[in-house]
């Protein structure tokens, strides 16, 4: 049994620290990406090209789709033939830690498609559960096996200075680690991520089918500095959820004892929903969660990704698109803040942050 990453001197850097690269997966699952994923593939391509300006992009694509991916991307990425069940690299990829000698360690969590038999979104996730270890093997990095502890990368944020941010709604959900107490879960996070403190937000984004991942509702943008998804509409269920998160954050400090500067990032003014036109595009397998017309999607500008040279921000053809870009431009003066049309990723059930996973330098 390997010592915990914390005992070995490893920690999880912040996303805004320098990257060696980014892991992504080509979107091909018919139950996630409607109409052969054509629109999703265009969106993924724009994201990959933007990230690739400042770092290496590793793209997992199975042999059957390699020619297709190459027709979009040419030689902009490193193609790896690692099998997957879907394209959520944030949740299936490894969490890569560093130590002060610059050595890296990949943490491999158990993955059960956001809830297993209790409320998972698909039932065959065998390949997804192997992505982290297989990718770490390609990178030739040692692996810390955190299994059977169930966790997705989208469920944690790190400030790189000892503070981990999570939501209670996700980490305490019955489909993850029902046999563990909150205290045991917190201790596992601290030991596995080399951290000093876990901050538990009560909620994420309304109707988020990941049981409200933190990466859709709040994110570190600097030392003791956060953005939080927000609405002023008291009739929106999101209002009470964001308000509870804000009240907690205003009382909290980071691992070093500093109070947070909190920037409110509005959610889109117009609700993003599944339409009748979207529905014929999906092809589901047995036991897979199905979409319905009028279903509210968990749209949030907080699901941005911080690459070496750019911050990639979801856009929804909404009045708040530019507001989000302006706020994030102030948070990241040294990076290009790029809006990416993101409805076609949202239709798959996540957004830009959910399909990317940073590999620290």
Curated annotation (Swiss-Prot):
The active site is at 354 (amidino-cysteine intermediate). GO terms for molecular function: agmatine deiminase activity; protein-arginine deiminase activity. The keyword Ion transport does not apply. It comes from the Bacteria. Its EC number is 3.5.3.12. It catalyses: agmatine + H2O = N-carbamoylputrescine + NH4(+). It holds the Pfam family PAD_porph. The keyword Hydrolase applies. Keywords: Hydrolase. One of its GO terms (biological process) is putrescine biosynthetic process. Belongs to the agmatine deiminase family. This is Putative agmatine deiminase. It comes from Streptococcus pneumoniae (strain Taiwan19F-14).
């Amino acid at each position: 049994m390997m010592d915990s990453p914390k005992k070995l001197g490893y920690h999880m850097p912040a996303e805004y620290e320098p990257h060696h690269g980014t892991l992504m997966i080509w979107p091909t699952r018919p139950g996630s990406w409607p109409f052969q994923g054509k629109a999703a593939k265009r969106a993924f391509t724009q994201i990959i090209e933007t990230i690739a300006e400042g770092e290496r992009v590793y793209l997992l694509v199975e042999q059957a789709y390699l020619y297709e991916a190459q027709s979009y991307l040419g030689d902009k990425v490193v193609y790896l033939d690692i099998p997957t069940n879907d394209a959520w690299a944030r949740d299936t990829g490894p969490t890569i830690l560093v130590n002060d000698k610059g050595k890296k360690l990949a943490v491999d969590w158990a993955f059960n498609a956001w809830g297993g038999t209790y409320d998972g979104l698909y039932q065959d996730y065998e390949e997804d559960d192997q992505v982290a270890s297989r990718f770490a093997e390609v990178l030739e990095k040692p692996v810390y096996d955190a299994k059977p502890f169930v966790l997705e990368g989208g469920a944690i944020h790190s400030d790189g200075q000892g503070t981990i941010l999570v939501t209670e709604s996700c980490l305490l959900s019955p489909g993850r680690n029902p046999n563990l107490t909150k205290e045991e879960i917190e201790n596992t996070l601290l030991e596995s991520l080399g951290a000093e403190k876990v901050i538990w937000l009560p909620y994420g984004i309304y109707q988020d089918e990941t049981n409200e991942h933190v990466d859709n509702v709040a994110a570190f943008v600097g030392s003791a500095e956060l953005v939080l998804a927000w609405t002023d509409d008291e009739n929106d269920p999101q209002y009470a959820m964001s308000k509870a998160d804000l009240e907690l954050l205003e009382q909290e400090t980071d691992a070093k004892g500093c109070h947070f500067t909190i920037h409110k990032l509005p959610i889109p003014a117009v609700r993003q929903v599944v339409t009748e036109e979207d529905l014929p595009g999906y092809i589901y397998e047995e036991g897979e969660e199905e979409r319905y017309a009028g279903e509210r999607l968990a749209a949030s500008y907080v699901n941005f990704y911080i690459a070496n040279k750019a911050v990639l921000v979801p856009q929804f053809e909404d009045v708040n698109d530019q507001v989000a870009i302006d706020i994030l431009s102030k948070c990241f003066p040294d990076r290009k803040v790029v809006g990416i049309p993101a409805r076609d990723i949202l239709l798959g059930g996540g957004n830009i942050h959910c399909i990317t996973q940073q590999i620290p330098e």
